[in-house]
């Protein structure tokens, strides 16, 4: 997805299981080893029909994909990466392995991180202007 919202999707011929992809308005979704060919369409609809911050919309897309069948096998991991205007991720949340729902774990982490995200950007760009978090060493 470029800065104008244009999308492009490519996967090689060796994709495993059910593979499909779809482009939406300022979004794209695709996957392999899917339980159903409609999973990416559900993800695009989840993204496009959700208002709010990009993280909220991406999590809604992941949840919509899961509700549409998700992966053919058990889901153990998920991640959320948001890149903004700087040379580092605005948000990078991961769940590398769980027996529970990793999308729920990402959503819970986003709920905690989202209100603080801009403060971390401020801390990186101009630490003296950043709010104090009240942790040892940050009085």
Predicted feature residues:
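N-terminal nucleophile
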Residues: 1-139
């Amino acid at each position: 997805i470029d800065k104008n919202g244009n999308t492009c999707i490519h996967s090689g011929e060796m994709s495993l299981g059910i593979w499909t992809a779809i482009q939406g308005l300022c979004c794209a979704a695709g996957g392999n080893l899917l339980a159903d060919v409609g999973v990416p369409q559900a993800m695009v609809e989840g993204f496009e029909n959700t208002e709010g911050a990009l993280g909220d919309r991406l999590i809604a897309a992941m949840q919509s994909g899961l509700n549409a069948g998700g992966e053919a096998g058990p889901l153990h991991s998920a991640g959320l990466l948001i890149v903004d205007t700087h040379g580092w991720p605005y948000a990078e949340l991961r769940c590398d392995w769980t027996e529970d729902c990793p999308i729920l774990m990402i959503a819970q982490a986003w709920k905690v991180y989202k209100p603080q995200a801009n403060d971390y950007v401020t801390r990186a760009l101009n630490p003296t202007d950043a709010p104090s978090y009240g942790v040892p060493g940050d009085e």
